[in-house]
UniProtKB/Swiss-Prot annotation:
The organism of origin for this protein: Roseiflexus sp. (strain RS-1)
Pfam families: Aconitase_C (PF00694)
Disulfide-bonded cysteines: none
Subunit structure: Heterodimer of LeuC and LeuD.
Protein name in UniProt: 3-isopropylmalate dehydratase small subunit
UniProt keyword annotation of Amino-acid biosynthesis present: yes
Protein's UniProt keywords contain Amino-acid biosynthesis: yes
Catalytic activity: (2R,3S)-3-isopropylmalate = (2S)-2-isopropylmalate
Length: 204
C-alpha cells in the first residue's frame, strides 16, 4: 500500500444517492481475487450499453474527465453488500479518493484498509463541488490527509474526520497487518516481560 499524504487532482462528480456496491462493480467480477483488470467493471452498467460499447452520456466516458483522480459521489455511497472488489475497482481505474456527504460503513472500512481515501464532507461543501464540476470539469482540489482538509479552488479549507489509527496507517502506507509486523519488537519485549503465571493463549 502506498503512503498517502497530499492528493491534488481533478474531480469528477457523480451526484447520485445510494450508489451501491453492485453498481460500483457487478457481481460477475467477484469471481477473481486478482485486483488487476477490475477497472473494466467499474460502473459497468452505466459506462457501457447492452452491446458493450461505451455510453457517451456517462460522465466517466467524457473526454474532459479522463485522468480525474477524485470522485465526488452522492450520499450513502457504497451501500449494499460488502465487496472488497469495489475499492479495488475504483483504485484500478485511477481514483485516489472519494468525497461524499456520507459513506456506507462497510464500504468505508474496506476502502480505507485498501488505501482508497474516503473524505466525508458536509452537504454544502458537496453541493459546491458538484457545482464547480458542472461549471468547469477540470476543477482541481487538494486533499491534505495530515491536516485533514480539502482545499477548494477559492482557497477555503474544509475539515474532514478520520480516526487516528487509520490516518497513521494511510500516512505510512501500511495496512493493519503491516502495522502489527512493524511492532514485532515491542510485542516480543512485552511477552518476555510478562509474568509466567499470567494466563496465555500461546502454545506451550
Amino acid at each position: 500500500m502506498q503512503p498517502i499524504s497530499v492528493i491534488t487532482g481533478r474531480i469528477v462528480a457523480l451526484p447520485v444517492q445510494d450508489i451501491d456496491t453492485d453498481q460500483i462493480i457487478p457481481a460477475r467480477y467477484l469471481k477473481v481475487t486478482d485486483k488487476s483488470g477490475l477497472a473494466e467493471g467499474l460502473f459497468y452498467a452505466w459506462r457501457f450499453d447492452a452491446d458493450g460499447k461505451p455510453n457517451p452520456d456517462f460522465v466517466l466516458n467524457r473526454p474532459e474527465t479522463q485522468g480525474a483522480t477524485i470522485l465526488v459521489a452522492g450520499r450513502n455511497f457504497g451501500c449494499g453488500s460488502s465487496r472488497e472488489h469495489a475499492p479495488w475497482a475504483l483504485l484500478g481505474y485511477g481514483f485516489k479518493a472519494v468525497i461524499s456527504p456520507y459513506f456506507a460503513d462497510i464500504f468505508r472500512n474496506n476502502a480505507l484498509k485498501n488505501g482508497l481515501l474516503t473524505v466525508q464532507v458536509d452537504d454544502e461543501t458537496y453541493q459546491q463541488l458538484v457545482s464547480l464540476f458542472d461549471e468547469d470539469p477540470t476543477t482541481t482540489v487538494t486533499i491534505d490527509l495530515a491536516a485533514q482538509t480539502v482545499t477548494l479552488p477559492d482557497g477555503r479549507g474544509v475539515h474532514f474526520p478520520i480516526d487516528p489509527f487509520t490516518k497513521h496507517c494511510l500516512l505510512h502506507g501500511v495496512d493493519q497487518m503491516g502495522f502489527l509486523l512493524n511492532e514485532e519488537a515491542a510485542i516480543s519485549a512485552y511477552e518476555a516481560s510478562r509474568p509466567a503465571r499470567v494466563v496465555t493463549t500461546a502454545r506451550s
